[in-house]
Structure formats: structure tokens, C-alpha cells
């Protein structure tokens, strides 16, 4: 009955071997699907800047065997892989798999960095643009944008702060559809205090990341309905998924 839909267990921030994840798309689908708990996941592999220093270091370490991001000439194949696995996930597990990407800006000047997820992405989006341009391009595709770990600041040399969207929220909040209020094991209480539309995600890269913050969405189990519920951000809750169980 409309209005009385159950909560769906969702994770909208998942990486695979298409970027810096440990598992293939098929292995991710089987990991989430085999729990019998998940209703919706989004595969959101990185689209990187050309001069991303972390990715360049990774390519050197792997002798060029991995790109650590989805390149423009591979993007159609990436979507085809996600589409094929989405069909299998729905048939085998009753689980929706949404195509996405994390448009990733890692600069040495950390105050300029942003990581932005596009959910239900249809076309490649370059990370070489400004955050404003990326957000507008996501909206132009009728996709959903998520500000990833928006209040993550670090003083570690090998980590990247990603606070540009948060530091410029007054100018950009109308373009950001959702803000991560929780990412893996971290809670960003400042996001909820501002009453911005929120989600919670695992930022999955390896199997142990399955046990982390997730989103509960009260919605019918189809992407148009889930997308509307996320935008409305009324029947939404955070949950901590632990040892195969969750609680709102």
C-alpha cells in the first residue's frame, strides 16, 4: 500500500576493481546479495583528474596494471558491466544496482578538493572541471549528487581533505542533492545540524567495509521511487550494519 512501504537497506557509495576497490563488480554484487539484507546498492567508481598524484603512485606501484579510476574511453564498457550485473543482481538477489561514479578531485592544495558522487549517471563527467560545473552536469543528466565525506579534514601527508563543498556550502548547497552524514565509521554531525538532505554510506573498498553506516529509505523498490524518496529526504534513517544485522 502506498505510504506504508518498508524501509530499504541501501549503500550508495561502493568501489570495485574499476577504480581502487579490491573486488570485481560481480564479487561486490555477490557479497552484498548473499547477506539477504540489502535492497539497493550503487557502484560508484572513481573518475580521476589527469594529474591525480595518489593514482599515479598506484599505477607505478602496480607497473601500470591498474588505472585506479574509470577513464573516458572505458566508460561505456564500465556502464555495460554495471548494467549486466544489475540484471543478475535483480534476478538472483532481488537487489537493485544503480550505476554511479565518484568524480574525484585530489589536489595538493587540500582546501580545493571535492569528491562528488553521481547516482544513475548516464555519461562520462570529467573531474577537470570546477565543482560547480560538475554538479551542474550531474543535474543535467537528471542524476543525483552526493557530497562525499564533506567534513573530512586531515593533517596526514598521505590523506586528502575533501572539504571544498562544505567550505562553500552557502554557494553550492542548492546544487548538492545529498550530503553524507556518515561515511564508513565516521559521523559528520555538522551535516545534520545544518538540516541538509543526508545519506549514510560505506565508501566500500574491501569486504570488511561492508560493516559500516548505511541508509534506510522508506520507498517502493524501484529507482524512480528511491530517487524521489532521497530527494524528499523525509522517510530516511541512518543505520549501523554489523554482523549481518541492522537497526534504525
Where are the model-predicted features located?
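Charged catalytic cores and adjacent phosphate/nucleic-acid-binding surfaces used
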Residues: 1-19, 25-30, 34, 54, ...
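Conserved beta-strand positions in the central sheet of alpha/beta enzyme cores
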Residues: 41-44, 146-147, 180
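Flexible loop residues that form catalytic
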Residues: 46, 150, 184
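Aromatic-lined carbohydrate-recognition surfaces of secreted/lumenal glycan-active proteins
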Residues: 144-156
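Generic beta-sheet signal
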Residues: 100, 148, 201-202
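An N-terminally biased module of ancient metal coordination in phosphate/nucleic-acid-related enzymes
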Residues: 1-99, 103-104, 132-135, 208
Amino acid at each position: 500500500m502506498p505510504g506504508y512501504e518498508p524501509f530499504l537497506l541501501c549503500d550508495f557509495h561502493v568501489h570495485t576493481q574499476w577504480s581502487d576497490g579490491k573486488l570485481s563488480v560481480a564479487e561486490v554484487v555477490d557479497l552484498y546479495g548473499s547477506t539477504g539484507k540489502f535492497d539497493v546498492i550503487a557502484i560508484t567508481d572513481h573518475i580521476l583528474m589527469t594529474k591525480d598524484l595518489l593514482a599515479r603512485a598506484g599505477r607505478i606501484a602496480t607497473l601500470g596494471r591498474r588505472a585506479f579510476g574509470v577513464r573516458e574511453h572505458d566508460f561505456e564498457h564500465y556502464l555495460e558491466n554495471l548494467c549486466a550485473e544489475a540484471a543478475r543482481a535483480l534476478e538472483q538477489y532481488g537487489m537493485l544496482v544503480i550505476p554511479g561514479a565518484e568524480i574525484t578531485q585530489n589536489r595538493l592544495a587540500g582546501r580545493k578538493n571535492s569528491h562528488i558522487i553521481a547516482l544513475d549517471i548516464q555519461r562520462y563527467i570529467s573531474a577537470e572541471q570546477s565543482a560547480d560545473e560538475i554538479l551542474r552536469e550531474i543535474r543535467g543528466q537528471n542524476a543525483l549528487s552526493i557530497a562525499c565525506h564533506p567534513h573530512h579534514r586531515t593533517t596526514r601527508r598521505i590523506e586528502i581533505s575533501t572539504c571544498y563543498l562544505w567550505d562553500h556550502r552557502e554557494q553550492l548547497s542548492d546544487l548538492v542533492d545529498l550530503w553524507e552524514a556518515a561515511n564508513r565509521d565516521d559521523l559528520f554531525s555538522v551535516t545534520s545540524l545544518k538540516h541538509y538532505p543526508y545519506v549514510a554510506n560505506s565508501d566500500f573498498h574491501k569486504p570488511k567495509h561492508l560493516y559500516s553506516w548505511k541508509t534506510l529509505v522508506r520507498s517502493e523498490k524501484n529507482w524512480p521511487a528511491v530517487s524521489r524518496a532521497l530527494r524528499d529526504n523525509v522517510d530516511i534513517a541512518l543505520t549501523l550494519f554489523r554482523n549481518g544485522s541492522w537497526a534504525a
